[in-house]
Amino acid sequence: MLDEERDRIITVTNILHKGDLPEDLDLGPLVAIDCETMGLNFNRDRLCLVQLSSGNGVAHMVQIEVEQNFAPNLCKLLSNEEILKIFHFARFDIAALLNAFGVLTRPVYCTKIASKLVRTYTDRHGLKNLLQELLDTDISKQQQSSYWGADALTDAQLEYAASDVLYLHKLKDELDLRLQREGRLDLAKSCFDFLPTRAKLDLSGWPETDIFSH
């Protein structure tokens, strides 16, 4: 299938790919990533969509087919040690990608963890709250619980999905400033480095267990 047949341009900034990223797509050394699934149970709910952005205002979205377990170009990016992957709530997305493709995503940066380390004055660490406070940007979460397993996703769904990655680079910059100011950059990196292991624990039967507790 030709790329132009496989890829559907949703808007100027949103591009939908069927099954995998194009082989020649270079998103650079810092890539924002998010996933949409059928639900929160890895044993039941499949991965449906993977969104990626290089921070240039363009969102590439890979629609995953039912029972698909291989996406070579996407997996190559996920496992590339030279590319830092930015997530919001990386723990879930790393586990979802590992469960779907058997690939462990690393290295990673999680804006939710960074927020918890520096925004200790609040318990509101959702992406919408972070963007409102740090970037003065408002995004809609109306499509969050919609049917992501559909053969044809709506423009509204894809606009929502894109919004989850388009701002993560700028958000990381703001959070890094605060982490540096509070002397917690090294602590944050240690947390990020543990996330792939935390995701493996989630998939191996310890999703609600703190193995470090008494």
Give the label of every model feature segment:
Residues 1-48, 52-214:
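DEDD superfamily 3′-5′ metal-dependent exonuclease/proofreading module
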